[in-house]
Every structure is written in structure tokens, then in C-alpha cells.
């Protein structure tokens, strides 16, 4: 399944009230469908969510979690071959992951946690609080091993987990959940089928990470 990210957009004040946002969004989704994409997903805030779930036919799946964690993620079974497959999950290829981590405007730092797990740090809400994520290096990604710093001591430093993971799987470790009232803009995760009715996707069936969109 191929999916495309629906970027957050706005209409210039001089051109508001003419239906341009809805028209251009519909044209963009039609173009994505013609290009072979099956789904579109987005990460709107509370104000933008009704426009996507109403006029544009997106389904609201869940709110994204936001946690400040101090240690690498907790893994219930460290010897398992990666995470369980979810209903919605990004499957990285070598080229796609290299491209994502090489963004010149928001470059991610990387280090191997162990031979199977890549740690990544990216732009966050403050210079001393980076966004943090971990990627399981399956057989398809093993050619990238030599590009990353080797495993080292665990850093007891604050980092932001922003996304959604199934309960009982890989989860933030020694973490504090940020209440909605303290977030500048709480984010939701929405999905749209570009070729028909959007099926219901349960929040516990989603693996969605900060690498799947640009929060900062």
C-alpha cells in the first residue's frame, strides 16, 4: 500500500472565502490517486481536523501521544525480530530512509542502539529537547549499518516522543505525558482512502512516528 502525506496548508487572506482550499485539496488527492497512491494521511491540529474529516472525507484515527522521555524506548521482548506489523505503519526502504535522514533543513542525528535498532534525534520544541525515535533495522535496511555511529552508553537526557504506538509494544521509557493544555497545538492522525470509503482503523493498530511527518 502506498500512502502520501497531506501537508498542512492555508489560504492567503486575500483569497479566502472562494472555496480554493477545498478545490485545490480535492485536485491534489485526485492527482495522488492517479499517480498510484492508495491512501493519504495527515497530522492536523484541533482547528484543522474538522475540515479534513468533513469536506475532505478523512477518518479521525487518534490523537498523537506527546511524551518527554529520559531513556531509550522500552522493548518488552528485546530479542524479537522487530515490532509487530500494524494496520498502518511506515515500511522503510534504504533509499527512503537515507533521504529522510538527510533533510538539510532538519537533519537527524543517528546512532546504533544495538545491531538491530537505530536511534534518531531530530528538531524538537527546544534545542535541549530533540525529537526522538527508534527504527528497527530489518534485513532490507542492514546495508545501512556502516553509515551510523556504533552503540555507546545510554544518555539520560530529555527527548520528545511524538507519535502513536500500540500498547504492549515498544513504548517510551521513564517518561512524562504532556497534557493537551500544555501543548502549543495538540495533533491528530487522520487517514483517507483515495479510491473509496475509508475503513476504520483502531488507534491500537497504528505505528506512527515523528519520522513520518515534520513537526518542527
Where are these regions (language model features)?
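C-terminal functional modules
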Residues: 168-216
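Conserved GNAT-family N-acetyltransferase fold
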Residues: 4, 9, 119
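Conserved beta-strand-loop-alpha-helix junction that forms the acyl-donor binding cleft
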Residues: 40-52, 158-171
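Amide-forming acyltransferase catalytic core, primarily the GNAT-like/NAT-type
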Residues: 33-39, 46-143
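Conserved acetyl-CoA-binding loop-helix of GNAT-fold acetyltransferases
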Residues: 11, 16-34, 138-151
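Short, flexible loop/turn elements at secondary-structure junctions
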Residues: 8-13, 44-46
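Structural motif
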Residues: 113, 133-139, 156-165, 193
Amino acid at each position: 500500500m502506498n500512502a502520501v502525506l497531506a501537508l498542512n496548508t492555508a489560504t492567503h487572506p486575500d483569497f479566502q472565502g472562494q472555496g480554493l482550499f477545498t478545490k485545490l485539496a480535492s485536485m491534489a488527492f485526485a492527482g495522488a490517486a492517479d499517480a498510484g497512491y492508495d491512501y493519504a494521511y495527515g497530522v492536523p491540529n484541533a482547528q484543522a481536523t474538522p475540515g479534513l474529516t468533513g469536506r475532505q472525507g478523512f477518518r479521525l484515527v487518534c490523537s498523537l501521544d506527546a511524551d518527554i522521555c529520559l531513556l531509550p524506548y522500552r522493548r518488552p521482548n528485546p530479542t524479537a525480530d522487530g515490532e509487530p506489523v500494524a494496520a498502518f505503519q511506515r515500511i522503510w526502504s534504504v533509499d527512503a530512509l537515507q533521504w529522510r535522514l538527510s533533510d538539510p533543513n532538519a537533519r537527524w542525528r543517528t546512532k546504533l542502539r544495538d545491531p538491530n535498532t537505530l536511534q534518531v534525534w531530530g528538531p524538537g520544541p527546544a534545542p535541549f529537547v530533540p525529537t526522538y525515535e527508534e527504527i528497527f533495522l530489518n534485513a532490507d535496511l542492514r546495508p545501512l549499518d556502516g553509515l551510523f555511529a556504533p552503540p555507546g552508553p545510554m544518555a539520560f537526557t530529555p527527548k520528545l516522543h511524538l507519535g502513536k504506538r500500540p500498547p504492549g509494544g515498544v513504548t517510551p521509557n521513564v517518561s512524562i505525558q504532556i497534557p493537551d493544555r500544555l501543548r502549543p497545538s495538540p495533533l491528530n492522525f487522520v487517514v483517507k482512502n483515495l479510491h473509496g470509503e475509508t475503513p476504520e482503523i483502531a488507534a491500537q493498530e497504528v505505528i506512527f512516528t515523528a519520522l513520518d511527518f515534520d513537526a518542527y
